[in-house]
């Protein structure tokens, strides 16, 4: 997917990129490749692949569930790595307030430089483990939306993310083709943490056989205070 086809696909979904937005994605790609020589951010470096498997893939929740992102919403991206999915979404939705939580300082240095290069405002970087962020009173139950992409299986991701969502907020999980199996495994965790599965959308990336699944979990009640458990526990002993 070259940049022109990327723009066409977005236009087909009702998102016409301005010249500024096209330039922001081009800058994003160049910065990613440049920084990737120093810090391992991605194994995908071919331009067409980055536009498809990072940029377009990150934007799929916005294309499928655009109403969730309307207005001046707050979004917390857990374990964003190189900024996926939150920063491609931010480029298309400038009114969004983004908070990125990541545990690796080198990745945050990249993100800090990238945000500056893209001239993005209302983006906050938090150097923290997800479990610690969920117990931080400045972050816990503060966000309209929480996203996670390629972070952990659904039962673990739920414990990382649901505590950060406001009641009536949403977790949007970007998963691969085996998400239904993960959902069965995560049923108890989602319920215990105060969530309810609202929607599961299966899709294929354009002109490929690459299957993706988007899972939307609505937070219907407050998360019990003991969750998330201390760092490392959710992964070792999933709910």
Swiss-Prot record:
InterPro entries: rRNA_ssu_MeTfrase_G (IPR003682), SAM-dependent_MTases_sf (IPR029063). One of its GO terms (molecular function) is rRNA (guanine-N7-)-methyltransferase activity. GO terms for cellular component: cytosol. It comes from the Bacteria. Keywords: Cytoplasm, Methyltransferase, rRNA processing, S-adenosyl-L-methionine, Transferase. It is found in: Cytoplasm. The keyword Lipid biosynthesis does not apply. Its EC number is 2.1.1.-. CDD domains: AdoMet_MTases. It is an enzyme of class 2 (transferase). Disulfide bonds: none annotated. It holds the Pfam family GidB. S-adenosyl-L-methionine binds at residues 79, 84, 130-131, 149. NCBIfam families: rsmG_gidB. Belongs to the methyltransferase superfamily. RNA methyltransferase RsmG family. Specifically methylates the N7 position of a guanine in 16S rRNA. This is Ribosomal RNA small subunit methyltransferase G. It comes from Lactobacillus gasseri (strain ATCC 33323 / DSM 20243 / BCRC 14619 / CIP 102991 / JCM 1131 / KCTC 3163 / NCIMB 11718 / NCTC 13722 / AM63). The gene is rsmG.
């Amino acid at each position: 997917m070259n940049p022109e086809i990327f723009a066409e696909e977005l236009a087909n979904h009702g998102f016409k990129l301005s010249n500024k937005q096209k330039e922001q994605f081009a800058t994003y790609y160049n910065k990613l490749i440049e920084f990737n020589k120093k810090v391992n951010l991605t194994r995908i470096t071919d331009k067409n692949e980055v536009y498809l498997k990072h940029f377009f893939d990150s934007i799929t929740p916005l294309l499928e569930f655009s109403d969730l992102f309307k207005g001046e919403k707050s979004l917390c991206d857990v374990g964003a790595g190189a900024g996926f999915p939150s920063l491609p979404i931010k480029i298309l939705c400038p009114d969004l307030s983004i908070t990125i939580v990541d545990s690796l300082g080198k990745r945050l240095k990249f993100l800090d430089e990238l945000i500056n290069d893209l001239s993005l405002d209302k983006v906050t970087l938090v150097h923290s483990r997800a479990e610690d962020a969920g117990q931080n009173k400045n972050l816990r139950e503060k966000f309209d939306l929480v996203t996670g992409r390629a972070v952990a299986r659904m039962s673990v991701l739920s414990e990382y993310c649901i505590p950060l969502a406001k009641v009536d907020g949403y977790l949007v999980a970007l998963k691969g083709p085996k998400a239904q199996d993960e959902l069965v495994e995560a049923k108890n965790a989602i319920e215990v943490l105060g969530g309810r599965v609202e929607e599961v959308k299966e899709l294929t990336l354009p002109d490929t056989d690459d299957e993706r699944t988007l899972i939307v979990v609505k937070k219907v009640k407050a998360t019990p205070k003991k969750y998330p458990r201390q760092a490392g526990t959710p992964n070792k002993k999933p709910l």
